């Protein structure tokens, strides 16, 4: 597949932005937006250790200009075996998109869903085919001028996923986007935009992967989730990148009245991950469930910042993030619950738990509250623990090998996450990858 992939553009510049936009035949409004993002990129500094949000994550070795941007293109092809394994059985999906090195090789959507108004395609294609549905929403949830990474993404994103669900349509099966990346020195910048109209329901699963010893690469992604009144979105982001990859991203949802978003973030791969996951509950009665799981080994570094923003009365958020760390892996969790003055009757819960398997591993956890309302319930907490040797001894006394005993304890630790995932394909993939991560643990 690599031979047929579009060439990666190099040397970040305003001319590159104009060239990529022109080659894609984009409308003037999008070209102008990209150029404005480029100006912000030039103006904004790269985050440093002086920034509190970046103090525990060292990116001093990162050179954004060293990665060539992968443009989006479409070319029919067969999925590489690792991507097929990552996606699993497509029969259980209502729709499927497969992307290799920026090239969309497959797009599948049942005719009955298309006839009922569901749109599931790349965002680049949607700009041309459905501008009336893209333009009002693109960039309204994630702004290009928030920091240098957002600006980098806003100027140069390509491909990504556009999912539009018309009013009242409920889709029972998940839609799946599978992405494989193995291009040396590539920058992959997908943008996902999900718009669910009133009283609709949909599930989007995005899986990403590259070979364990794969090429050096950069991923900078953004996800905008927009559920209208009474709509429900379930979003899963599962990555198994190779260790030579940097990943930066943001997943942000803005919820209207009585809307619901369930998000699940899973990180198994990459050398360094820095991701923001945020829910802004702006409509009365809206609900956000935020789940996260990270399993680090070697020298992997995972940094998650979460925000539960309650801006309306009678809203509910529930966050549970868990990390398992071995070898010299490190995790950073910074979570904020914010309840504005008008957010009375708020219910907000935030919990981060970490399990350390090796002496050299480390977890930093910083849960926070900002409360302006006075009639609400907010709880937050964090814990970091190590394996209980007494419990391991007890299991081994029942003729279980130590490796099996430890795996049972890890499974028990993660069961709180697994039990809240209704998607069998996701639970199965998580279980398989956790088992692989534990193979060399003694």
Predicted regions and their residues:
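Generic hydrophobic-segment detector
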Residues: 27, 40-43, 91-92, 349-350, ...
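Short, conserved phosphate-binding/catalytic loop or strand-edge motifs used
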Residues: 411
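Conserved beta-strand/loop scaffold segments within soluble protein domains that form the structured core
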Residues: 111-112, 116-400, 414, 418-442
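N-terminal amphipathic, basic helical "cap/leader" segment at the start of enzyme domains
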Residues: 2-151, 176, 320, 325
């Amino acid at each position: 597949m690599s031979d047929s992939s579009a060439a990666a553009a190099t040397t970040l510049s305003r001319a590159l932005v104009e060239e990529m936009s022109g080659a894609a035949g984009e409308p003037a409004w999008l070209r102008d937006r990209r150029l404005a993002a480029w100006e912000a990129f030039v103006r904004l500094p790269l985050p440093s250790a002086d920034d509190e949000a970046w103090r525990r994550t060292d990116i001093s070795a990162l050179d954004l200009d060293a990665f060539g941007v992968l443009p989006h293109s479409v070319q029919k092809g067969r999925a590489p075996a690792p991507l097929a394994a990552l996606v699993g059985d497509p029969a259980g999906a209502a729709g499927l998109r497969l992307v290799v090195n920026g090239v969309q090789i497959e797009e599948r959507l049942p005719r009955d869903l298309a006839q009922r108004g569901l749109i599931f395609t790349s965002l680049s294609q949607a700009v041309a085919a459905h501008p009336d549905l893209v333009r009002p929403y693109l960039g309204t949830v994630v702004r290009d001028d928030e920091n240098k990474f957002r600006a980098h993404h806003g100027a140069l994103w390509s491909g990504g996923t556009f999912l539009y669900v018309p009013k009242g349509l409920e889709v029972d099966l998940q839609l799946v986007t599978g992405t494989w990346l193995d291009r040396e020195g590539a920058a992959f910048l997908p943008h996902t935009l999900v718009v669910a109209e009133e009283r609709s329901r949909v599930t989007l699963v995005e899986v990403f992967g590259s070979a364990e010893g794969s090429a050096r690469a950069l991923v900078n992604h953004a996800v905008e989730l927009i559920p209208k009144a009474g709509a429900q979105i379930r979003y899963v982001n599962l990555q198994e990148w190779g260790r030579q990859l940097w990943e930066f991203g943001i997943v942000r949802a803005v919820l209207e009245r009585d809307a619901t978003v369930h998000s699940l973030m899973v990180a198994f791969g990459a050398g360094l991950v820095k991701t923001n996951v945020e829910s802004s509950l702006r409509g009365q009665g809206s609900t956000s469930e935020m789940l996260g799981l990270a399993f680090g080994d070697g020298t992997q570094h995972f940094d998650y910042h979460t925000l539960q923003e309650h801006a309306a009365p009678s809203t509910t958020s529930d966050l549970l993030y868990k990390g398992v760390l071995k070898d010299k892996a490190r995790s950073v969790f910074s979570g904020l619950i914010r309840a504005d003055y008008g957010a009375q009757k708020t219910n907000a819960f935030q919990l981060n738990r970490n399990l350390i398997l090796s002496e050299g591993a480390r977890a930093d956890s910083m849960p926070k509250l900002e409360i302006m309302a006075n009639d609400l319930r907010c709880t937050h907490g964090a814990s970091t623990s190590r394996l209980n040797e007494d419990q391991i001894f007890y299991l081994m006394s029942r003729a279980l090998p130590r490796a099996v005993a430890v795996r049972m304890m890890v499974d028990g630790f993660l069961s709180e996450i697994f039990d809240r995932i209704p998607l069998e394909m996701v639970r199965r993939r998580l279980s398989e990858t956790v088992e692989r991560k534990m193979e060399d643990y003694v």
